[in-house]
Amino acid sequence: PTYNEDLNVVKNTIYASLGIDWPKDKLNIWILDDGGREEFRQFAQNVGVKYIARTTHEHAKAGNINNALKYAKGEFVSIFDCDHVPTRSFLQMTMGWFLKEKQLAMMQTPHHFFSPDPFERNLGRFRKTPNEGTLFYGLVQDGNDMWDATFFCGSCAVIRRKPLDEIGGIAVETVTEDAHTSLRLHRRGYTSAYMRIPQAAGLATESLSAHIGQRIRWARGMVQIFRLDNPLTGKGLKFAQRLCYVNAMFHFLSGIPRLIFLTAPLAFLLLHAYIIYAPALMIALFVLPHMIHASLTNSKIQGKYRHSFWSEIYETVLAWYIAPPTLVALINPHKGKFNVTAKGGLVEEEYVDWVISRPYIFLVLLNLVG
């Protein structure tokens, strides 16, 4: 699927898809162009792949894929974001599991990135510390897999067509159509699997604003699912599966308490308001051991997937921006729209994003005043 990405971004994915090690008579490649661009249609014709453009654009990416499913007749569907370049071995590594397990509806592989995200670029940590998404595509998805609760992540996955048709195609009710789709598959009694071997590589978000915009969509979408199709209720899920889904949803609500902790000292410094009625020594005796224990425990469990110090940076930067939309989604899950993540951009020179930086500058100034 593609919407507004440059043709050069899509070309790499198509060329790599043509080179996948699989019988050519069983491999059908489609460009799903929601932008309806003539250059894309011409390119598809030149390289021998199929092309679909919609006349209407409802339900964004999910609607684009569902429209293509009307024409694609294969028993299995593999989906790649337009910037995710698959390896030659992708189908060889994933398809065998479907033959072994007839109830397997979806096989997910990691999202691996060959370019630095804004944190890695700005802090000079590319390939030196774990990527922000490494924790999810490492420990979290491995744990989900153990409890048969692997999430569909929208790309780099294979889905069996029959179960997908049974649930009406890709879910369109929320902006995280991928996780919602896997939830529906699990409710129908189908299984899923995760293979922690990268079989595709894509482009990380180039700018901090694009990165934050993507996380806002994920956060809002997971809270929408919690409100509209709560995994704690309804039929079809095992207890462990319910916990796995709720854990992912509650993670995105962490922005609210983090903002409270960031601003609580200022309430005392500026307004002399006591958040906790206790002497400073008693607070330190209770809080510091907990903080040290939590940090050491997380470091022990997460190991090479997420470092505690960098985790605080990731979560603090995002907290300002995911707290409002998640709160709104809790109150009104139908509010908001799907935001496309920009791909294929190139940051040619360093600059300060004053708009994104505004909350942090404001907090620093308040602390100085305090």
Regions found by a protein language model. Name each.
Residues D33-F40, T56-H57:
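A conserved acidic beta->alpha catalytic loop
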Residues P1-Y15:
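Membrane-proximal cytosolic interface modules of multi-pass membrane proteins
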Residues I52-F76, R88-V175, H186-R187, A204, ...:
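Long helical/loop segments within the catalytic core of UDP-sugar-dependent glycosyltransferases
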